[in-house]
Amino acid sequence: MYIVNTSFMVEPSVHDRWLKFVTEKYIPALRARGFGKVVFTRVLSVDAEDHFTYSLQVNADDMEAYRLIVDELFAEYAATAGALFGQRVLWFNS
């Protein structure tokens, strides 16, 4: 099993809209594609006073599922979120 972690840094000006998008659209889309174990948490950091930080962890049972998340689902997220929020939401996988 693999855990795919994505960290998000969200500017306050788009925070509420982005949070609604992730919780009402993106996470349900992940679950609909068969990824039942999804953990979404806010990360508190002393260095993050000017933005909100979140972590999204998705369990992938095998390398095929991992590739689906990284190659397809995150690309879909990037296209949609990029159009909605631009550079006001930064994210990276680890």
Regions found by a protein language model. Name each.
Residues 39-52, 79-94:
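Glycine-rich beta-strand-turn "strand-cap" elements at beta-sheet edges
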Residues 13, 64, 76:
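Short alpha-helical
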Residues 28-34, 62-66, 80-85:
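Glycine-rich loops and low-complexity Gly/Arg-rich segments
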Residues 68-80:
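Intrinsically disordered, low-complexity terminal tails and linkers in eukaryotic proteins, enriched
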Residues 22-23, 35-37, 57, 73, ...:
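Short, charged/polar low-complexity linear motifs in solvent-exposed/disordered segments
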Residues 2-9, 41-71:
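Short, well-ordered beta-strand segments in beta-rich or mixed alpha/beta enzyme
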Residues 14-40, 78:
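Short amphipathic alpha-helical segments
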